[in-house]
């Protein structure tokens, strides 16, 4: 069966959003937006706290396992130009717009769990995980009473066209994996993927049913990468390979530059239980600040 035949477009949801906004010329949508934006902490936080402590579920579907491993091991902290940082920020702000659209058509949306915290999943002793965009009830394209994961993404025109033509699984497999990992860990059977074309504000919606095989395969991949002391193979041995040329880890991976000096690039560091890291040399637990500094006995992991 082709992937195209398995795509379930969320046409009822998209049509309801467009009709609702047109009916009152966006009044209800804007009112909801005003209530939602203050809760989008990621859009206006200050310092980002440095390297991410965990391996993210949003990355685990990526083609290159070595790049994922390098990121988890803090090999190189990328510095982005202002345009790219504004692009990241736009993605956070768009979440508020998506939520306001759903609220304006009567969908119930939860951005936080019962403890008032962002929906998060955890795996591999807490070293692998991520946070979902929300949970919804009352999505027009799903049976009544179905709670569904929410995932929101922004796309440029070329990427958006691929999404419309091929569906999310074929055109953005990392997103498909991310959603299934979240649904599997959260006990949800379905999800709603909403995307916007940043160039013309066209919307795309897709219903995703839990794919247990894919979810378990990539949860297993995440666990293996977390505890792997040796770097996985490169996707290409050529530094000129087009995917490698655009990778943040190319300087360390292909050009033999030194990785950043920190505990995670040291041969003595080991991920352990309860999301902790330990030092085999000093026989101690390493908190995040200590990991970032390293120590005088630092010895670069030869895998870098």
Where are these regions (language model features)?
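Metal-dependent nuclease catalytic cores that hydrolyze phosphodiester bonds in DNA/RNA
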Residues: 1-149, 156-158, 296, 304
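Metal-dependent nuclease catalytic regions and adjoining charged, substrate-binding loops involved
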Residues: 5, 162, 166-176, 181-278, ...
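Conserved active-site beta-strand-loop modules that form the wall/rim of enzyme catalytic pockets
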Residues: 145-152, 189-193
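Short, histidine-centered active-site or binding-site loop motifs used for metal coordination
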Residues: 154-156, 197
């Amino acid at each position: 069966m082709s992937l195209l035949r398995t795509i379930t477009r969320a046409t009822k949801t998209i049509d309801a959003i467009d009709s609702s906004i047109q009916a009152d010329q966006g009044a209800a949508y804007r009112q909801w937006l005003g209530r939602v934006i203050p809760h989008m902490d990621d859009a206006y936080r200050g310092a980002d706290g440095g390297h991410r402590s965990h391996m993210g579920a949003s990355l685990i579907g990526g083609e290159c396992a070595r790049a994922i491993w390098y990121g988890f091991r803090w090999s190189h902290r990328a510095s982005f130009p202002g345009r790219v940082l504004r692009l990241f920020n736009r993605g956070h702000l768009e979440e508020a717009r998506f939520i306001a659209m759903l609220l304006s058509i009567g969908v119930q949306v939860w951005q936080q769990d019962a403890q008032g915290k962002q929906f998060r999943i955890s795996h591999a002793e807490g070293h692998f995980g991520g946070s979902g965009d929300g949970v919804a009830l009352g999505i027009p394209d799903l049976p009544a009473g179905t709670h569904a994961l929410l995932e929101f993404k922004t796309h440029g025109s070329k990427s958006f066209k691929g999404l419309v033509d091929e569906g999310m699984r074929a055109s953005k497999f990392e997103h498909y994996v991310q959603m299934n990992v979240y649904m599997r860990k959260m006990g949800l059977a379905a999800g709603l993927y909403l995307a916007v074309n940043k160039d013309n504000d066209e919307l795309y919606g897709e219903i995703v049913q839990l794919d247990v095989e894919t979810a378990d395969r990539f949860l297993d991949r995440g666990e293996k990468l977390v505890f792997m002391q040796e770097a996985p193979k490169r996707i290409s041995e050529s530094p000129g390979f087009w995917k490698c040329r655009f990778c943040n880890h190319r300087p360390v991976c292909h050009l033999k530059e030194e990785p950043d000096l920190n505990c995670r690039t040291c041969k003595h560091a080991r991920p352990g239980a309860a999301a902790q890291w330990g030092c085999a040399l000093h026989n101690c637990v390493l908190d995040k600040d200590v990991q970032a500094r390293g120590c005088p006995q630092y010895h670069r992991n030869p895998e870098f």
